[in-house]
Regions:
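Non-catalytic substrate-recognition and accessory regions of acyl/acetyltransferase enzymes
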Residues: 1-164
Length: 164
């Protein structure tokens, strides 16, 4: 069962914006989830990201990423754990999906996010996202766009606040 190590989102500066961090663990595996608002103040970058997403990205849309905490601390992002560090439990990925859904729902409720953008950095992560997003949390996500961006590894989750 996931254990949420953060009581609230930790806010920290990220360029002109404030990013949000939430930590959790499953068994002995520590994870971090980061939310960074998509930059809309730079017209060239905003156009690039909007083209990638397939719509003009409004404010309050967030890039969301998660990784193992040790990868984040070492700067070797998305590196899989060694075989000896992998969980052997069959329901580990279900618990991981539950934790991510809970944290995204909490973020949505606190920050009234309009959309979340994510990129599956590895084929294994893409398979995980594809499986999880077959049944997104409908109280938060009303539309999922998958297969976006370079290599079709990108996702957009539009929320109930998207048109507000």
């Amino acid at each position: 069962m996931p254990v949420y190590l953060s009581d609230n989102f930790v806010e920290f500066p990220h360029g002109d914006y404030t990013a949000h961090r939430f930590d959790f663990c499953i068994e002995t595996h520590n994870f971090i989830v980061l939310f960074a608002e998509v930059i809309t103040s730079d017209p060239e970058y905003h156009d690039y990201r909007s083209d990638e997403a397939g719509f003009k990205i409004p404010t309050r849309c967030y890039d969301v990423k998660f990784d193992r905490l040790e990868n984040f601390e070492r700067g070797n992002f998305y590196e899989p754990p060694s075989k000896s560090q992998c969980s052997r439990r069959l329901n580990f990925t279900d618990e991981l999906a539950e934790a991510l859904e809970t944290i995204i729902t909490l973020h949505h409720n606190v920050y009234r996010a309009r959309a979340y953008l994510a990129v599956a950095e590895t084929p294994k992560l893409k398979r995980f996202y594809d499986r999880v997003l077959q049944q997104p949390p409908h109280d938060v996500v009303y539309k999922v766009n998958a297969g976006l961006g370079e290599g079709g590894m990108g996702y957009v989750l539009k929320t109930q606040y998207f048109n507000h």
